[in-house]
Every structure is written in C-alpha cells, then in structure tokens.
Regions:
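Histidine/acidic-residue-rich catalytic or RNA/ligand-binding cores of hydrolases
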Residues: 190-198, 211-214, 250-260, 270, ...
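A short acidic/small-residue loop/turn micro-motif
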Residues: 42-47, 69, 380-381
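Divalent-metal coordination cores built from histidine and acidic residues
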Residues: 56-61, 72, 76-192, 196-257
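Divalent metal-coordination and catalytic microenvironments
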Residues: 13, 29, 34, 58, ...
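Mature N-terminal segment immediately following signal peptide/propeptide cleavage
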Residues: 3-38, 55-68, 72
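Extracellular/periplasmic ectodomains of large secreted or surface enzymes and adhesion receptors
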Residues: 1-8, 12, 372-384
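Acidic, glycine-enriched loop/beta-strand segments at the rims
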Residues: 2, 15-28, 41-42, 296, ...
Length: 384
C-alpha cells in the first residue's frame, strides 16, 4: 500500500485512456495528491525523485470501474475495491449510507467514493425500509425539502408513486434545479417520464410496459415484446437526454424463476433493446443492483460488462458505461479517464480490456483517491 498524497509512477504501461479506442504503449503515468500529474513515453523524462515506482511492463493502466447502481452496505466496501471499483452510485439513501459516505471521505473507513440519491420516494405499500411515502401529491414539496435538508443531491423516484405524486415531485425537483432518477412508476408511462426530464431510468423500467404484448407481467413483460416499437422509444429517449442503467446481469439471475423459454426471451429481448439504445447513441451506464440478495457486490460488475458485450456493445463501449460516461453522468471532470488532471482512480490489469472484456477481472492493483493497493493488499482487505 502506498498512501496519497505520495507520488506514484507506473512505468512501461499500456494506457487505456477511454477518450477513444486507441491505446498508448510504453507510457509512464505519474499520480500525486489524488490526481494524474503526467502521462509520457517511458524514459522520456527522469522519474520524480520522491515517486514510488510500480513496474507495468506487459500490463494495462485503465480507469477504475464505477458501479452506477448499488445498495451500499458497510460490509461490502472491500468487495468493490477487490473488483477494481473505486466509485459507486448508491441508489437508495438513508442514514447508514450517509454515515458510510462520511467515514470514507474522512479517511476513517476504506471504500469507494460514494455518490448517492435520496431515500426512495414511493407510494403505498412501500417495498423497502427507509422509504419516504408520498401518497398525497400535496406532500411532495415537503418530502423533497426533507431530502434536501438531509443532504441528498438528487431524488430517487420509485414504483408505487401515483401519477399525480410523481408530477408533484418532478415540479418540486425542477423548482430546485435538482435531478430525479430511478424507476418509472407503474402509474406513469415511460414517455411521460422522458418528457418530464427524468435523468436516469434504472433496469429499463417503464420500457417493458411500452413494448410488451403481455401486460400485467411486471418487469418480466420482456418475455413477449414487439421489437418494432423499440426504435421510436429510443429516439424519444435520446431527445429527452435521459440515461439508462439497464442492470442486465441481475435479470439473468431474477429470470431463473421463469420457464426456460420465457427466461431465454427475457434475456434476449433486453439485449436487443440495449443494442438499439447503443445503435442510436443513447446514453448507457453500467450498474449491478449490488446489495440485493442475488447479486455479489464487486464481482457482479464484471458480469454486467460481459452482458453489455453480449448485447452487442464493443468492449470499449461497454467499458465506457462503467468509466468515462459514468464520470460524465456524475459530473466529475476527468473521472473514468486516464488523462492529465483526472482523479487518480486507476486499475492496473494483466490484460487489455478492449481486446477482451474478461480482462477487467485480471486485477494487479488499484488506486483509490490516489492511494495504491497491490493485488496482495486488495486480497488482504476484510471481506464478509
């Protein structure tokens, strides 16, 4: 382990910047004080005298991964780091998450950088603990003000909201220039959510009802869809500027309790829809729903990337959804790239992830907020 703000020099690495698909071979990357200080051909300049040198011959330096949909638990923090994830977006805020975030930021606890939305704003009956019920649209203003007071920068909208409550939450959010994201409530069409300016849609929620031939199947409406509806929905999504975090891998697990043919259709049709999002240029984020029972925190991100490639994305575009594009969504300049001035959230790999997405699993080490953890140091981190 080498702790920030010390200088660290990675020598003779192949750099995957994520700015484009091109790689830079035989580079020296110097990080200091949590930032990337320089990227130069190895040997072109003397190394900083105070730098710890990490030899990277035959290795690839890429941005650390960003899991854009987690439900954060303290016990899981090491699992994210072991998987090369240095940043997470927590998708249900509550006091325990606020405490974890504070402890990580103060240095009291080691974990990924945490971005979080508010408590879920939902109607009755609530599905999860720490729900803020908004059964009366007139209560939306108060509910949103409570979330602001609690320090949450964005709102989470959820499944059981009435159309009226959803619209009232949207209006309260817009008065504050505040993002809202999450599910498309059952009472709201996906087109209405897009027109309302929902910033991200999780799990392709709402699209299922718009494309299915079998209403009333909930999330598993994907078993029987009309693909001729995909194109226009995606066009409208791009027009609205809404991002999608499709959480593909968890549906591979959740669909196991369906018939074999329905399961195969659910997986295939979700892949087809994601392929259309990518083909038209809609914005995609890689997220796992980690913290939900069927998903393993950390390792599930590699499953998610594999699923995005199975949907037809190139390894580069799949990886962008977990690096550069995620950083753009989070509005952190440079995050998810290997560029000068960017946050030093980097992963050293024993293979090129643009050649095969499976290489994201071959982790030789990770920098988190500018501190370096070798594979051995990561392996030694406590796990549940």
């Amino acid at each position: 382990v080498v702790h920030a703000p010390a200088a660290i020099a990675f020598t003779n690495v192949r750099v995957v910047s994520m700015i484009s698909e091109s790689r830079l071979d035989d580079q020296t990357v110097v990080i200091r004080d949590g930032r990337i200080e320089s990227i130069e051909p190895s040997g072109s300049n003397p190394l900083p005298v105070d730098a710890t040198v990490i030899g990277g011959r035959g290795r690839v330096l890429a941005p650390a991964l960003i899991d854009m949909h987690v439900h954060l638990l303290r016990a899981d923090l090491p699992l994210y780091l072991k998987a090369g994830i240095a940043t997470v977006r927590n998708m249900w805020g509550h006091s325990a998450v606020a405490a974890i975030k504070r402890d990580i930021e103060s240095g009291a606890t080691l974990g990924p950088t945490v971005h979080s939305v508010s408590n879920g704003l939902d109607g009755s009956p609530p599905r999860w603990p720490a729900t803020r019920l908004v059964n009366d649209p007139r209560d939306a203003e108060t509910a949103v003000q409570e979330m602001v007071a609690a320090g949450w920068p964005a709102l989470k909208v959820y499944q059981q909201l009435s159309a009226e409550s959803y619209d009232s939450i949207v209006a309260a959010a817009k008065r504050r220039n505040m993002d809202f994201m999450g599910h498309v409530p059952t009472a709201v069409t996906v087109l209405h959510a897009l027109e309302s300016g929902q910033r991200s849609i999780e799990h392709l929620s709402g699209y299922d009802r718009a494309v299915t031939r079998r209403q009333g199947m909930g999330t598993f409406a994907w078993a029987d869809v009309d693909p001729s509806r995909f194109g226009e929905l995606v066009r409208r999504t791009i027009e609205a500027g809404t991002w999608n975090c499709p959480t593909m891998a968890i549906f591979v697990e959740l669909s196991r309790n369906h018939t074999a043919s329905d399961r195969a259709s659910i997986i295939a049709n979700r892949r087809l829809f994601v392929a259309e999002l990518q083909r038209q240029g809609a914005r995609l984020l890689a997220g796992t729903d980690a913290g939900i029972d069927v998903v393993s925190p950390g390792s599930s991100m590699h499953d998610e990337l594999r699923e995005l490639v199975a949907a037809g994305l190139t390894p580069y575009h799949a990886l962008r959804a977990a690096t550069k594009d995620a950083g753009e969504f989070l509005r952190v300049p440079g995050l998810g790239t290997v560029t000068v001035g960017a946050p030093a959230e980097l992963v050293l790999l024993d293979g090129d992830p643009l050649a095969s997405i499976e290489n994201t699993r071959r982790i030789a080490g990770l920098t988190v907020r500018g501190s370096w953890y070798s594979a051995a140091a990561l392996a030694a981190l406590g796990s549940r």
